[in-house]
């Protein structure tokens, strides 16, 4: 571990150290330390797609959906064809809707806000599904929930059938 830290400090752009440090910290559920590595990397290259994507993912895993969404949307402005960035953006909107929906005493305004987040999540998650059709374990449940809440009967029926089938490796 110390070797990875030292290597990253001395050669932050060398592609060996950054992903291994991030992987180690995330596997140990030390997202705070993983974010420290990302922040250091962004000081060296603030426009790196890899570093920004990693930041978006860590923020998402920390439950910081608004911040994750901001980073994801910045990346999507530059290139909207990266599947995982679409997934992060869609999931950030989805998570915000789910969080608001936990309150059973919803006002009309709050309900509209929730539906708005589901609506915003939809294109990103559908795009991710089209780009990564075999990643059903990532897109199926969020799309199922969105289709259900937005009363998209045809799409809901399709995803319901997909979810009832066993996953293929």
State each model region's role.
Residues 25, 59, 93, 100, ...:
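Residue at a conserved register position within TPR or TPR-like alpha-solenoid repeats
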Residues 20-24, 55, 89, 96, ...:
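Structural register within alpha-helical repeat arrays
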Residues 95-124:
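Short coil/linker segments at helix-helix boundaries
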Residues 6-7, 40-41, 72-75, 127-128, ...:
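Canonical positions in the second alpha-helix
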Residues 12-13, 46-47, 80-81, 133-134, ...:
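Short coil turns that delineate tetratricopeptide repeat
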Residues 17, 51, 85, 137-139:
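TPR alpha-solenoid repeat register
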